Amino acid sequence: MKDKTVVITGATSGLGRATALQLARKGALVVGVARNESKANELVKEIEKHGGKGQFVVADLSSMKDTAGAGRSIAGSVDRLDILINNAGAHFPKYGVTSEDFEFTLALNYLSPFLLTHHLMDKIEQTAAEHGEARIVNISSIMHKAPINWDNLNYGDGGYRSTVAYYQSKHMLTSFTYLLSRKLKESGITVNCIHPGFVKTALAKSDYPFPMNVIVPIVGLFIGEPPERAADTPVWLASSDEAKRMNGEYIHHRKAKKSWPPTRDKDA
């Protein structure tokens, strides 16, 4: 990973933080994108303490304005972009819309990675042309198995269900992965998505409504993985020679799996 540049969203906590630290230890320049500046500075210090290189762009990725700005800033500040890891995402128990009138789950989990990838694509394509390859990794989830309600995608007609909104967002991100991998298949750029497993830090959050705020952390004690272990597949997919051959795949524990059939529908 020496001399390579990695961009990771949501890099200050959980899976994103663990992935950033491990890739930095492998020699990559890690460019994180996150909204909490103090946490970002702490992570850069941690990276540098171990001899790595890190820098940050502060942005609220639920904002399309901030996302576009972050993309332009990164594209203008790095010489190459070898790996983009779209990791940032969240579950929003209560309905809300951003200042741009997008439902929060839709904005953060799908629209933002779509837009950030768009703004970084020229730099990624340039890197692939000059150095032979580049990689895009989208953090999806096993929780992508819900049909998309295109008629009420933003929940403007009411009926918000947080779990369904989350499933739909990961459905869209998974489908986007397949579409982009086909589009870029002759470019030297691979595009894959990952179900990282159930990460303890995410499962321990208590912002779910009752009784889920009690059930979810308990479930996490039994099936959740610590972020350091869950980062194994993202790090492997971003850095290994073996993963270089994988493209257009839904991956769990380093193995290609079949996602829900509607996500693979080329005509959808």
Task: Give, region by region, the residue ranges found by the protein language model.
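N-terminal Rossmann-fold NAD(P) dinucleotide-binding loop
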Residues: 16-17
